[in-house]
From Swiss-Prot:
This is Ribosomal RNA small subunit methyltransferase H. The gene is rsmH. Belongs to the methyltransferase superfamily. RsmH family. Keywords: Cytoplasm, Methyltransferase, rRNA processing, S-adenosyl-L-methionine, Transferase. It catalyses: cytidine(1402) in 16S rRNA + S-adenosyl-L-methionine = N(4)-methylcytidine(1402) in 16S rRNA + S-adenosyl-L-homocysteine + H(+). One of its GO terms (biological process) is rRNA base methylation. Specifically methylates the N4 position of cytidine in position 1402 (C1402) of 16S rRNA. One of its GO terms (cellular component) is cytoplasm. It is an enzyme of class 2 (transferase). One of its GO terms (molecular function) is rRNA (cytosine-N4-)-methyltransferase activity. The keyword Cell membrane does not apply. It is found in: Cytoplasm.
Length: 324
């Protein structure tokens, strides 16, 4: 199915009580779900894509869903408990290729979808600490039961290290100013421990606003990525994902910022090329054959979807198919 055909596929409406994921119709079209196929939703969230896959599967089809967020897992287990076609895994993205292979799925997956970033329920719950628009503890962990919160990270790092995080993971031009403001507040005995406290610090530190963007946007992105090791998780996931796919199996990844999308783009490019071979080797040896074929160009949300869901503006869907 071409990129144009993916975009043209009519999107099924989720029910009034469910949230439509970004690029819902395009992602499901990209997977080209067969009724008897085996599919993986690597980032369940609240199950929007999973429901769409299940609607297209027959009685012999199988769906594996995974997430590392305990609330998402509880939702999946409650919602999918009565469907014998489904298996729910609690797993970080990086662990998923190994866990699925242990379940006997190596070279057996017909389609795998990864919708990167945070889900709407995570953003909307102030207790999770992801949003600068709602006051709550400065947490930002995808799994609140493990690891270091954003507040703890900011209390531990030096100004130089905080600036490095903001610059590298948020592409923040004012990283130095913001880092110094955070450390000054910390030294004064008032470190940012809530989302609004951090947002106010950033607003005061940044000399001018970008039109249409809150000054704290890049800071919150950078801290979330750092707290959850999102880029490391993505890299390790991509390293093992091809071996899961059956020949002709599809990989579909939705990214929400350039740091993620560049990684996915480079991965597909490398896996779909044979590299630089000397002229004396006119036919690539077996070990150098391309393993993926990119399907069309990157896909983005149209104006109608962006109007209904502003988060869709930055989403990019890339699709590739395993060759052998």
């Amino acid at each position: 199915m071409s990129a144009a055909e993916m975009c043209a596929v009519a999107e099924q409406e989720p029910t009034a009580t469910t949230h439509r994921p970004v690029l819902y119709g395009a992602a499901l079209a990209a997977l080209d779900v067969r009724p008897d196929g085996c599919y993986v939703d690597a980032t369940y969230g609240r199950g929007g894509h999973a429901r769409g896959i299940l609607e297209r599967l027959g009685p012999q089809g199988r769906l594996w869903v995974a997430d590392r967020d305990p609330e998402a897992l509880a939702h999946a287990r409650e919602t999918l408990a009565d469907d014998p076609r489904c298996t729910v895994l609690g797993a970080e993205l990086a662990e998923l290729p190994r866990l699925l292979a242990e379940q006997g799925l190596a070279a057996g997956v017909d389609g795998l979808l990864a919708d990167l970033g945070i889900s709407s329920p995570q953003v909307d719950n102030p207790d999770r600490g992801f949003s600068f628009q709602r006051d709550g503890p400065l947490d930002m962990r995808m799994d609140p039961t493990t690891g270091e919160s954003a507040a703890a990270l900011l209390e531990r790092l030096s100004a130089r290290d905080i600036a490095g995080v903001l610059r590298q993971l948020g592409e923040e031009r004012h990283a130095g100013r913001i880092a110094r403001a955070i450390v000054a507040a910390r030294d004064a005995g008032d470190p940012p421990r809530t989302t609004l406290a951090l947002a106010r610090l950033v607003e005061q530190a940044v000399p001018r606003r970008e039109p249409g963007r809150h000054p704290a946007t890049r800071t919150f992105q950078a801290l979330r990525i750092a707290v959850n090791d999102e880029l490391g998780q993505l890299d390790r996931f991509l390293e093992g994902v091809i071996d899961l796919l059956a020949p002709g199996g599809r990989l579909a990844v939705i990214a929400f910022h350039s740091l993620e999308d560049r990684r996915v783009k480079r991965f597909i490019r490398r896996a779909s090329s044979v590299g630089d071979l000397p002229p004396s080797v006119p036919v690539p040896p077996a070990g150098c054959q391309p393993r993926l074929r990119p399907l069309g160009r990157d896909l983005r949300a149209d104006e109608g979807e962006v109007a209904g869901n502003p988060r869709a503006r930055s989403a990019v869907l890339r699709v590739a198919e395993r060759l052998s």
